[in-house]
A protein has these predicted regions:
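Domain-terminus/edge residues, biased toward the C-terminal soluble/receptor-binding domains
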Residues: 136-137, 148-153, 157-316
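Active-site-adjacent loops and short helices of periplasmic peptidoglycan-processing enzymes
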Residues: 2-171
């Protein structure tokens, strides 16, 4: 559901952006959220998800090792963000994932993709299939890293759906997205330490993810999330003009959600809401409850106007 932007007293300097309250699912802000974007390194969220799903199902282990191909190595020499792996290196899935998540290594993406699916092209098919499963209706993946390709596209709304899935289904692995650095103890060379590229992690605001992106055709992008006092917000923006504006505007958007809206717990799944009469049953009444916690996000100025009602329409 969406809270109308007519409330909004904020303008985000991005080509497209969206903000969601995680628990309620309410959209608190949107700006052209369904226009096509080139997701750049935000693509790596899906690359990671494919691996996490396989690990969760028992079909892949963090200790499994993949051999680096020449194709993967070439990406480390082409000026892209890299883990700096070498042809023939045997690298664990765990190290490759850290190289993808923290160092944003395009070379690590290809090594992981080839190790899982045989070729990067086959891996991209898995990525697109997963996107469709998640309801990412305007997304297609053509590679594992997000390097420029007209067939590698998405929307900020779809990136939001992907980010929600990551946080919901893989909370333990999601913690890796908040790590500030990763050291690659490579064979036959000095260790390489790289810092996380997400600027919000270095601010004292509760940010714990997710992934930056940059392409010349798209400018700067960021999928970000913070959690404060148990409340999580997710923001996705693309088309920021500079690195500084990406950091500033993303911070502004998340802060807007925190300061202008409250998250209200309507009902816990374990709590009885009411009792209803039973016709010709063993009991005269049964308890009524919901099967999941219900949350509502509401503008702070309208919080006192919130009313909850139960409507019982009888047995079906």
């Amino acid at each position: 559901s969406s809270i109308s932007n007519s409330y909004s007293n904020i303008e985000i300097k991005a080509r497209t952006a969206i903000l969601q309250d995680f628990l309620s699912g309410e959209i608190l802000y949107e700006k052209d959220p369904d226009i096509k974007i080139y997701p750049a390194s935000m693509t790596k969220i899906m690359t990671s998800i494919i691996a996490f799903d396989l690990i969760k199902s028992g079909d892949l282990s963090l200790d499994d090792k993949f051999i680096v191909s020449e194709k993967a190595w070439r990406l480390s020499t082409a000026g892209y963000s890299s883990m700096f792996i070498m042809v023939g290196d045997e690298i664990s899935v765990e190290d490759l994932l850290h190289g993808i998540i923290t160092a944003s290594g395009n070379d690590a993406c290809v090594a992981l993709a080839e190790g899982i699916a045989g070729t990067e092209e086959e891996f991209a098919i898995l990525m697109t299939a997963k996107a469709k499963e998640l309801g990412m209706e305007n997304t297609n993946f053509a590679n594992s890293s997000g390097i420029n390709d007209p067939d590698n596209y998405s929307t900020v709304r779809d990136i939001l759906k992907m980010s929600r899935y990551l946080i919901q289904k893989h909370p333990d692995f999601y913690e890796w997205f908040s790590l500030l650095e990763f050291t690659w103890d490579r064979t036959g060379g000095d260790p390489i330490t790289q810092g996380n590229r997400n600027p919000l992690l270095y601010k004292n605001m509760g940010a714990d993810g997710i992934k930056t992106g940059y392409l010349a055709v798209e400018k700067y992008s960021l999928a970000s999330s913070l959690i404060r006092n148990g409340r999580r917000l997710i923001a996705v923006g693309s088309g920021f003009e500079t690195k500084n504006s990406r950091s500033r505007e993303s911070s502004k958007l998340l802060t807007y959600g925190l300061t202008n809206f409250d998250l209200v717990e309507i009902n816990k799944s374990s709590e009885t809401i009411d009792k209803v009469d039973v016709w010709l049953g063993k009991e005269n009444q049964v308890d009524v409850y919901v099967n999941e916690d219900i949350f509502k996000t509401i503008k702070k100025a309208k919080k006192n106007l919130l009313k909850v009602a139960l409507k019982y329409e009888g047995p079906r």
